């Protein structure tokens, strides 16, 4: 029995030796997590109609904004590279990382207090198309999420960052699965009694479990938490690198908030349609793009630190080609099989056929940028590994302004339905990635991309031919694909 526990422990805390093995573990666990995530969405669609789900999804907008600024802005671009840089000195590592975590958490408390006090004032400006009763419900649920979910989720994500910096990915990948399970269970057992409070309760419990399950990572790390805030070199580096990335996230969150605002003018259920279509498109992006990006950062940072520029260049070319090889066929599948996919994932009792069709069309326009969206996360990590967070920031600001401009034109000038927001997103994402690619090429210098362009062309042509043949050889008379 002791031998069994020892093997289990070694398996859970084993360190990965390559990007491929790390990305594989992350991808498998993200697939499982996303599977439960879509069971969550299907469960919600079975208990609540799309108008009611508007309230639920809109309640996450403000908590998500705070979370993205503090965690996505801090963790992905700065925390992991700094952790790796100081991990050879245990004392300095513990002081520096503890200071960073404590500083961010104090900032979180400040945001929570301010937002809870003034939420009723500015929420009507975010959701102007909602009734007063609907806005009051959004405010109530937003406060519960700010107070009950956010602290656990923020601390849990710092543990995730520590695990990834140590190249220990299994436990950090299990945590989101349990988060989704908690929401599903709470909805099934309590939705009929406490309505939308049931999934909100599940979110809070899930966030707590998300934190607790990752606490063992502290034991198996050279980092020892200290309750201190100390002016260290690492803290200054952290904020110097974080500020551009945080501004990128702020602009992106403004973009997401404007999307919510615009959908409130498009009728009841529009935000649910937009939200579900976007998250279905994010399934392959998360499994492939985000997983690969997360797994690549520690290795890219290490190569840059050791001056292995040629290996860095080779990994960039090979990684982009591998990502295209996986995502271009998936993009085609999502476009041609959009309606069955939406019905499969979201076809609950209260999710009617009109909602299915509108979500499917929106999904197809989101999917056009799927390969570029997947590569985006890897390209930004390349810049972060080179200790450059400013370039992705400037490019993101430009692409987000483009997205907002197109969205406003499509909705208020041409009066297009909700799928127009997906066209705006895809256009801006493609532009973003193309500019990132060009600037990264210049930054690395002397990189041969001929094989990348040649193989990508082959993949694209083969995918197009296979998709067209499959589409027109389907059962005669069917028009729902």
Which residues does each PLM region occupy?
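Membrane-embedded alpha-helical bundles of multi-pass transporters/translocases
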Residues: 2-481
């Amino acid at each position: 029995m002791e031998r069994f526990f020892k093997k289990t422990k070694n398996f859970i805390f084993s360190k990965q030796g390559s990007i491929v093995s790390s990305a594989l573990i992350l991808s498998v666990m993200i697939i499982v997590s996303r599977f439960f995530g879509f069971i969550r969405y299907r469960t919600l669609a079975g208990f609540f109609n799309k108008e009611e789900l508007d309230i639920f999804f809109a309640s996450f907008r403000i908590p998500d904004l705070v979370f993205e600024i503090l965690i996505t802005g801090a963790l992905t671009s700065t925390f992991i590279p700094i952790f790796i840089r100081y991990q050879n000195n245990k004392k300095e590592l513990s002081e520096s990382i503890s200071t960073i975590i404590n500083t961010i958490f104090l900032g979180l408390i400040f945001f929570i207090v301010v937002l809870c006090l003034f939420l009723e004032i500015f929420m009507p400006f975010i959701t102007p198309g909602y009734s007063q009763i609907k806005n009051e419900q959004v405010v109530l649920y937003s406060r519960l999420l700010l107070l009950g979910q956010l602290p656990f989720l923020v601390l849990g994500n710092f543990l995730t960052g520590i695990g990834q910096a140590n190249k220990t990915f299994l436990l950090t990948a299990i945590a989101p699965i349990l988060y989704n399970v908690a929401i599903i269970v709470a909805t099934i057992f309590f939705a009929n009694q406490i309505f939308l409070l049931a999934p909100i309760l599940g979110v809070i419990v899930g966030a707590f479990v998300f934190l607790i399950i990752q606490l063992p990572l502290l034991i198996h790390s050279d980092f020892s938490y200290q309750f201190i805030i100390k002016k260290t070199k690492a803290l200054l580096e952290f904020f110097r690198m974080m500020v551009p990335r945080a501004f990128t996230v702020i602009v992106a969150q403004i973009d997401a908030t404007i999307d919510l605002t615009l959908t409130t003018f498009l009728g009841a259920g529009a935000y649910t349609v937009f939200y579900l279509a976007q998250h279905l498109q994010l399934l392959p992006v998360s499994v492939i793009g985000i997983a690969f990006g997360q797994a690549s950062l520690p290795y890219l940072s290490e190569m840059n630190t050791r001056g292995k520029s040629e290996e860095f260049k080779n990994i960039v070319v090979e990684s982009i080609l591998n990502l295209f090889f996986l995502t271009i066929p998936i993009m085609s599948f999502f476009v041609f099989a959009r309606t069955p996919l939406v019905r499969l994932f979201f076809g609950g009792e209260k999710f009617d056929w009109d909602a299915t069709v509108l979500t499917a069309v929106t999904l197809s326009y989101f999917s056009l940028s799927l390969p570029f969206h997947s590569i985006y996360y890897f390209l930004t990590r390349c810049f972060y590994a080179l200790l450059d967070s400013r370039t992705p920031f400037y490019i993101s600001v430009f692409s987000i302004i483009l997205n907002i401009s197109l969205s406003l034109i499509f909705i208020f000038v041409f009066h297009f339905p909700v799928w127009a927001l997906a066209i705006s997103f895809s256009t801006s994402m493609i532009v973003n990635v193309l500019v990132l690619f060009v600037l990264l090429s210049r930054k690395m210098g002397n990189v041969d991309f001929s094989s990348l362009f040649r193989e990508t062309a082959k993949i694209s042509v083969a995918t197009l031919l296979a998709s067209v043949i499959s589409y027109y050889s389907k059962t005669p008379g069917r028009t729902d694909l």
